[in-house]
């Protein structure tokens, strides 16, 4: 199991994860929160603009993960199986880090997928992981360090996408999709671990936001269970200092990701996020989730 190989900031064997604040509870908001430490609220952009394709996402005044890595010589690639313009993702990642973008339209243009091919949001995660292997090998042969970011989509609501790798293990479709996604991610991580570049590579796995299908949630999840997003840092050169069950949000992943690369962060805070490898308290640990979320 991948969780046994990495760090999710728990004290024992119980799986931990990140709380999600308002403004970070949809894909674009989640990706911005995890890379800049801020919630994406109406003071920044009208959320209605993020419901389709847009290039109007212009967030000034932030210094994001992508900005920092670009300034330190990293080559950065974002790979997604949908259209990057959806929700303003292309605009954000090009403005903050000068990411090269490989998306559904890129795959059509370079004939990685056949003309007219479209399933689910564009192309399925099985293809995304295959394309990502080729890109990782290409990047590893260059002199610059690299940041390769993938956004999977097969587990998106409603019910997820059943690909050719999915088994019929469970009575409902979404559980089968979840199981398939877990196997694919584990296989991709195992592949990375077999490559020469792995020794100097940190892997960060994180969910963007909570699943939104109320029918599945009410049927399959205990109402007393505290839902969080999955978080796992694998092969980081530094170790956790505070060996308790950390209470943290996806905003804390911004400084924590930098710290996982060996970056020394003065004060161990960036944006509204706290470096979880440090002994500094997060906003949730200081004030509680409900208080912070209401602000």
Walk through the language-model features, giving the residues of each.
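Solvent-exposed soluble domains appended to multi-pass membrane proteins
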Residues: 1-295
């Amino acid at each position: 199991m991948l969780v046994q190989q990495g760090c999710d900031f728990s004290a024992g064997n119980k799986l931990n994860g990140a709380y999600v604040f308002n403004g970070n509870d949809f894909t674009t908001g989640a990706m911005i929160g995890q890379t800049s430490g801020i919630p994406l609220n109406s003071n920044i952009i009208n959320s209605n603009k993020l419901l389709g394709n847009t290039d109007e996402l212009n967030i000034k005044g932030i210094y994001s993960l992508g900005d920092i890595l670009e300034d330190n010589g990293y080559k950065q690639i974002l790979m997604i199986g949908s259209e990057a313009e959806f929700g303003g993702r292309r605009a954000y990642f090009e403005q903050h880090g000068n990411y090269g973008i490989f998306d559904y339209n890129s795959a059509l243009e370079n004939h990685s997928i056949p003309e007219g091919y479209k399933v689910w949001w564009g192309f399925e995660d099985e293809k995304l992981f295959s394309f990502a292997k080729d890109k990782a090998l290409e990047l590893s042969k260059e002199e610059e360090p690299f940041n390769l970011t993938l956004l999977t989509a097969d587990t998106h609501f409603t019910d997820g996408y059943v690909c050719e790798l999915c088994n019929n293990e469970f009575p409902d479709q979404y559980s089968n999709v979840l199981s398939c996604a877990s196997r694919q991610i584990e296989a991709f991580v195992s592949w990375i671990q077999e490559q020469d570049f792995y020794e100097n590579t940190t892997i960060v796995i994180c969910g963007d936001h909570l699943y939104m299908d109320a029918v599945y949630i009410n049927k399959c999840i205990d109402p007393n269970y505290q839902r969080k997003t999955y978080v796992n840092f694998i092969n980081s050169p530094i170790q956790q200092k505070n060996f308790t069950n950390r209470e943290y949000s996806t905003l804390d992943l911004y400084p924590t990701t930098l710290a996982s690369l060996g970056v020394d962060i003065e004060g161990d805070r960036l944006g509204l996020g706290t470096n979880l490898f440090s002994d500094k308290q997060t906003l949730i640990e200081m004030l509680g989730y409900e208080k912070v979320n209401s602000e």
